[in-house]
Amino acid sequence: EETYMPILEVEHISKSFGKTEVLKDISFSLEKGQVVSIIGSSGSGKTTLLRCLNFLERPNTGIIRVNDDILFDGNNPATWQESQVRKKRLHFGLVFQNFNLFPQYTALQNVMLAKELLAKEQSDYKEHKKEIHSQIQKQAEGLLIQMGLKDRMGNYPHQLSGGQCQRVAIARALALQPDILCFDEPTSALDPELTGEVLKVIRELADNKTTMIIVTHEMAFARDVANHVVFMDDGHILEQGDPIELFEHPKEERTKQFLSRFSQDEY
């Protein structure tokens, strides 16, 4: 029988900005190939949680483990050394809500950039420069084709729609082959008619067993694509569990209130 082997374990993470406690004792785990949706009203700490996982914010307390390696331990400052933090970030890919593409680079260059910078740090880069470059380019082209952007590789961000930019951003995150792909409200900056094309790509990634954490306002999507849903409220995880269970039989009054704002046909 298969043993439950979490790819990610988050234990007792807390985070304050000044006197404001934004994350309060957050714990959850994620299995390889699983999708977790994080829902909750604005200001509940969802984005801060993603930023902590991606080593963009330093938690005050708690432990983050990936593949059984302790990446962060609040009691051990040595786990947060600038030199290591960059490397630790590579376990996670983060897709931001407003794409954050570089305007001066084409779609293809945007996807290749991080990988090229990493390659330059390898000792054998100079002698294998050509092969490395063409390998990276080939991989980037493959990802853009997978995103349905075969004809857009040479376009700059200003020549692309929001939905296309977001798909370039997804390809860019995938290029580094992260263990876990994180999305922060991937559709909230898009026109409603472009939302579908981005959700479709994320759904395909889920079907291909990409391990993902998705912070989203799209309730139908959260329920549909996730194996596990986490409801955050005021910096706490108030309730978490199976999507159908949580959406149809929420245990907490606050969860019921939150979900009642979305009509049933939305999920």
Tell what function each PLM region has:
Residues 181-184:
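Catalytic Walker B motif of ABC-type/P-loop ATPase nucleotide-binding domains
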Residues 175-179:
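A short, proline-enriched helix->beta-strand linker immediately N-terminal to the Walker B motif
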